[in-house]
Amino acid sequence: MPVNRTIRAQSPGEFRLMSYGVNAYSKVSAAKEVPPRELEAILLMKGAAKLEAVKREWETKKDLTEALAYNRKLWTILVSSVTDETNPLPQNVKRDFSNLAIFVLQSLISLAAEPAVDKVNCVIDINSQIAAGLRA
């Protein structure tokens, strides 16, 4: 049986914090309705889109650092998930994905040290191809 409670904010700032909490919960609840493979595909495409945006502003390299950080974090999480011992994927798939993740992460590090459009294109292509495979 649900418990009804009235929560009163002691200050306007506290009310905003409660609102942020409700909004965050709503976003997480909505995300739970997306199948995991589709969510991974969406996140990979978001990473590709961030890098595409950098390409459009290549002369200034606007948002390069943020795009690289997003993709590094994403690939770190993906490889951690895939290689987890509780993941039911076959060992050869885990190994192959790990090798791909190492390549992508090295490409991102190289891109941070020496920015080049061909390196950006490589990561965009990999993100897009993996996303397409997840959606197939």
Language-model features: locations:
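N-terminal intrinsically disordered, cationic/polar leader segments
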Residues: P2-I77, T83-D84, P90, K94-A136
